[in-house]
């Protein structure tokens, strides 16, 4: 019957809408506080060390050209009881390298971390090499980790008598889990009376919204925005000594971030990135291409055979100017980013021409955004 058929269609439509509701993107997406801010003080620490890579197949440093490699090799052998004073060292299987890595936050003794190894001398390739024991120091001069292991190289180099080929960077490699943490950085998180959230992108509105979300969750005013990049959180009494549990809950809170209207321009590559809040006032845009062509066709004048004249070269220059038909487009007040792009694309404008047009619109005071040129 018609009534039964219509009611069935309605039920199916309602069920489809309910099923698709979770997939619908809101007009203003929210993000976790975990993705918007870091816990102040919880960060990685950079480490650096100097070492030697051995086992290279003749692609290491030239010892006569790189004195520090030779000195390091001599010092290492002497520490191991090998006396080479006065001896001539000839090898191409050793290279001096710098070793870098990032010590993770809260890393404990025995934790492994990745390191990057980079050649310092004239080594052609580190392929097949092994890094010897290398202490890794922090900015305070203390040793926090020790690195050693076989290198993984992303490139290669090969050469013959008259030709050579190189792919990638064969003088740079990595050692996965190649360093062991030997010293911990003291950071008593659970004993802190307050914690600060450092926003990755400072903004007054976002900082206020984060503080409001935390206060609503805890039911008390414990969070306060200090500046656009910092929200200070006083630890409630029930979470004293258990700050980790509090931060675990706070990190999952959803907040709608606010961003300033900004246009990023990279003139070298022609890349333009515009935020969603960019607005333009009413403005007319005209764009035309002007082409100037110059051609030289010198004319040679020869004298009579029996005269004493000289050959003369007379310059002849032809200059031509062509201009494409200009187009005029009207960009209305308060248009969105998509409407702005569509309007400018209607003029047949490329990315590099668009850069100049956006800067001109900004100079005219018709664009409500900051333009940052990289």
Curated annotation (Swiss-Prot):
User: What processes in GO biological process is this protein linked to?
Assistant: bacterial-type flagellum-dependent cell motility
**Where is this gene product found?**
Periplasm; Bacterial flagellum basal body
Which family is this protein grouped under?
Belongs to the FlgI family.
Give the organism, scientific name: Nitrobacter hamburgensis (strain DSM 10229 / NCIMB 13809 / X14)
Function, as annotated, reads:
Assembles around the rod to form the L-ring and probably protects the motor/basal body from shearing forces during rotation.
Q: What is the first-listed, main subcellular location in coarse terms?
A: periplasm
The answer to whether UniProt assigns keyword Cell inner membrane to this entry is: no
Q: What is this protein called?
A: Flagellar P-ring protein
Q: How does it assemble?
A: The basal body constitutes a major portion of the flagellar organelle and consists of four rings (L,P,S, and M) mounted on a central rod.
Signal peptide (UniProt feature, chain positions): 1-29
Q: Which PANTHER family match?
A: FLAGELLAR P-RING PERIPLASMIC PROTEIN FLGI, FLAGELLAR P-RING PROTEIN
Query: Per UniProt, what is one GO molecular function of this protein?
Result: structural molecule activity
Entry keywords, A to Z? Bacterial flagellum, Periplasm, Signal
Q: Which gene encodes it?
A: flgI
Q: Which domain of life is it from?
A: Bacteria
**GO CC annotation terms, alphabetical:** bacterial-type flagellum basal body, distal rod, P ring; outer membrane-bounded periplasmic space
């Amino acid at each position: 019957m018609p009534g039964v058929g219509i009611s069935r269609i309605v039920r199916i439509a309602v069920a489809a809408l309910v099923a698709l509701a979770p997939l619908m993107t809101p007009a203003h997406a929210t993000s976790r506080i975990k993705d918007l801010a870091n816990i102040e003080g919880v960060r990685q620490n950079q480490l650096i060390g100097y070492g030697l890579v051995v086992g290279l197949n003749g692609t290491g440093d030239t010892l006569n050209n790189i004195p520090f490699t030779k000195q390091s090799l001599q010092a290492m052998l002497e520490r191991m009881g090998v006396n080479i004073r006065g001896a001539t060292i000839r090898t191409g299987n050793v290279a001096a390298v710098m070793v870098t890595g990032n010590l993770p936050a809260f890393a404990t003794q025995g934790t492994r971390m990745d390191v990057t190894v980079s050649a310092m001398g004239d080594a052609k390739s580190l392929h097949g090499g092994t890094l010897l024991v290398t202490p890794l120091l922090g900015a305070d001069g203390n040793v926090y980790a020790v690195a050693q292991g076989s290198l993984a190289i992303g490139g290669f180099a090969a050469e013959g008598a008259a030709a050579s080929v190189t792919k990638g960077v064969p003088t740079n490699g990595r050692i996965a889990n190649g360093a062991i943490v030997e010293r911990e950085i003291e950071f008593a998180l659970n004993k802190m009376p307050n914690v600060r959230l450092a926003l990755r992108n400072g903004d007054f509105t976002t900082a206020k919204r984060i503080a409001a979300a935390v206060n609503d969750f805890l039911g008390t005013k414990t969070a306060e925005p200090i500046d656009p990049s910092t929200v200070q959180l006083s630890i409630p009494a029930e979470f004293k000594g258990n700050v980790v549990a509090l931060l675990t809950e706070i990190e999952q809170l959803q907040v709608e971030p606010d961003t300033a209207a900004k246009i990023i321009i990279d003139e070298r590559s022609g890349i333009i990135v515009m935020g969603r809040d960019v607005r333009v006032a009413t403005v007319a845009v005209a764009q035309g291409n002007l082409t100037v062509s110059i051609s030289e066709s010198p004319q040679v004048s020869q004298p009579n055979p029996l005269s004493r004249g000289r050959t003369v070269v007379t310059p002849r220059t032809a200059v031509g100017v062509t201009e494409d038909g200009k187009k005029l487009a009207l960009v209305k007040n308060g248009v969105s980013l998509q409407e702005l792009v569509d309007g400018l694309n209607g003029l047949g404008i490329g990315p590099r021409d668009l850069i100049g047009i956006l800067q001109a619109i900004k100079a005219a005071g018709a664009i409500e955004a900051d333009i940052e040129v990289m």
